[in-house]
Regions:
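Active-site-proximal beta-strand elements of phosphoester/diester hydrolases
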Residues: 2-23, 107, 120-122, 151-159, ...
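Short loop/turn motifs at secondary-structure junctions
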Residues: 6, 43-44, 88, 151, ...
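Solvent-exposed loop/turn segments at secondary-structure junctions
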Residues: 13-15, 54-57, 97-100, 127, ...
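Cys-nucleophile CN-hydrolase/nitrilase-fold catalytic domain and related Cys-dependent amidase chemistry
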Residues: 24-114, 195
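CN hydrolase (nitrilase-like) catalytic-core segments centered on the catalytic cysteine
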Residues: 72-91, 160-267
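Short beta-strand scaffold segments in enzyme catalytic cores
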Residues: 93-95, 107-110, 143, 209-212, ...
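Active-site catalytic loop in hydrolytic enzyme cores
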Residues: 99-172, 187-191, 195
Length: 269
């Protein structure tokens, strides 16, 4: 598995439009994401992460949104599958999905470099409104998916507040956590990364997008001017306690020089 990879996170504000009809809604959304993707594709990222409900129109009322989602079907998903295939990258596409029984899931689909679906995560902790108004059922699994660069877990928005989910991931030792959200999460982002000992790539619609290392320290973030961030990360890492390892850390640095980085975030040992 390749260990040094490039990751991109996109976090533009949702489109504040009310398209005239469903076909226009789908076409406009695809054009929107095509423009956004064009900003990061020149960096040839291995993974692109999109925000929660990335193809939703907030201005639509419930009836309009249901009609749009049902017309949309897999059209926007298939657009992202084509982008992933043509650019040989993984894409985390987060969207509402209707099940055959009429219930809904808030899901992130991990699309691989061939445009195939490598895994699906269903939000474990939907909000009260999602459950009561949209018949969104909670996911029960905390799956970790194997990619060609490492093991990946996913979380969506409100999930980040629940230690139980992070604990399930921590036991599986993922290399990276994908976080698609409408909510930033604040200190819970760093806590999630540190608890799972995983890199963390957050895509939030509007606020800053963070890429954090397994100690919860920021590697890179988006700004108020540019709602996107790209960074190179190295998944060949190990989190160790300083006590009992001082001599080993000195020895590995002496042996490998600039080939190894010893990072200390301070104060946590």
């Amino acid at each position: 598995a390749r260990r040094k990879i490039v990751v991109s996170s996109l976090g533009p504000f949702p489109l504040q439009l009310r398209p005239a009809d469903n076909q226009q809604a789908v076409d406009t959304m695809i054009s929107h994401w095509k423009r956004e993707l064009e900003q990061v594709l020149p960096d040839r990222p291995d993974l692109i992460v999109l925000p929660e409900a990335c193809d939703r129109y907030p201005a639509m009322n419930k009836e309009e949104r249901l009609s749009y989602y049902r017309f949309r079907g897999d059209k926007i998903r298939d657009f992202f599958r084509d982008v992933a295939r043509r650019n040989r990258c993984y894409i985390a596409y987060s969207a509402a999905r209707e099940m055959p029984d009429g219930t809904w899931r808030n899901s992130t689909l991990l699309i691989d470099r061939n445009g195939e679906i490598a895994g699906i995560y269903n939000k474990n902790y939907p909000t009260v409104g999602e459950v009561t108004e949209w018949k969104t059922l909670a996911g029960k699994e905390a799956p970790v998916f194997q990619t060609d660069f490492g093991r990946v877990g996913m979380a969506i928005c409100f999930d980040l507040n629940f230690h139980e989910l992070l604990e399930r991931y921590a036991k599986q030792r993922p290399d990276l956590i994908i976080f698609s959200s409408m909510y930033h999460g604040g200190l819970m982002q760093g806590y999630g990364a540190y608890h799972c000992r995983s890199y963390f790539v957050g895509a939030i619609a509007g606020p800053e997008n963070n890429i954090l290392n397994p100690l919860g320290a920021r590697v890179a973030c988006s700004t108020n001017y540019l709602p996107r961030v790209t960074a190179a990360i190295n998944l060949d890492y190990q989190v160790v306690h300083l006590d009992e390892n001082w001599e080993k850390l000195e020895a590995v640095k002496k042996k490998y020089g600039r080939g190894v980085t010893v990072f200390d975030p301070g104060f946590v040992g």
